[in-house]
Amino acid sequence: MRIILLGPPGAGKGTQSERIVQRFGIPQLSTGDMLRAAVAAGTPVGLEAKAVMESGGLVSDRIVVGIVADRIEEPDARRGFILDGFPRTVAQAEALGEMLASKGLSLSAVVELKVDENALVGRIEKRAAETLARGQAVRKDDTPEVFKQRLEAYRAQTAPLSAYYAQKGTLETVDGMQPIDKVTADLMAVLEPHEERVAS
């Protein structure tokens, strides 16, 4: 089962990804972790990434897709994986699709956690106020201002992925504003039919 979980910052992707990993026994593949591991291992693609990072450049989509391609060949990913932090753009989604197709694979499901962005901002503001009320400092990345910037970046860059996968017929949506356990139950209901197709 090959899964992508989409949703804005604060939607609960981290929590739900952990539960998917536990339920289906597939690894969560974080592009950041994979990059660091490839660099440390000195793989051809890792060496290429290292040179780019050391020069202060951004690692290209081609390099990231190459790292994902290497990682999914490892034994623990044979039954599938959940991608974390990738793809972030439609161009990356297209490159990922081409790479999987070249291996005779495809995505099982792309699930978007749908949330009310105003409610998310409200949650962050409430959390910041509670932290201040306890006499503690609010972490810079937990301030409502920074959170709003992250939401805007998501809307501009990553939100178009929903339309891209919807057009391909692979997008499923789950209401991310529900209690955490209800979100998990809805996610499992969406994902479990794909598990049977893989097993048969």
Curated annotation (Swiss-Prot):
Reactions mediated catalytically: AMP + ATP = 2 ADP
Gene3D superfamilies for this protein: P-loop containing nucleotide triphosphate hydrolases (3.40.50.300)
Any Gene Ontology CC annotation: cytoplasm
Alphabetical UniProt keywords: ATP-binding, Cytoplasm, Kinase, Nucleotide biosynthesis, Nucleotide-binding, Transferase
EC number: 2.7.4.3
Pfam families with a match to the protein in the record: ADK
One of the record's GO molecular function terms: adenylate kinase activity
GO BP: AMP salvage
Binding site for ATP: G10, A11, G12, K13, G14, T15, R127, Q178
Enzymatic class: transferase
Annotated metabolic or biological route of this protein: Purine metabolism; AMP biosynthesis via salvage pathway; AMP from ADP: step 1/1
Known partners and oligomeric status: Monomer.
Domain notes: Consists of three domains, a large central CORE domain and two small peripheral domains, NMPbind and LID, which undergo movements during catalysis. The LID domain closes over the site of phosphoryl transfer upon ATP binding. Assembling and dissambling the active center during each catalytic cycle provides an effective means to prevent ATP hydrolysis.
Function: Catalyzes the reversible transfer of the terminal phosphate group between ATP and AMP. Plays an important role in cellular energy homeostasis and in adenine nucleotide metabolism.
Protein name in UniProt: Adenylate kinase
The organism of origin for this protein: Methylobacterium radiotolerans (strain ATCC 27329 / DSM 1819 / JCM 2831 / NBRC 15690 / NCIMB 10815 / 0-1)
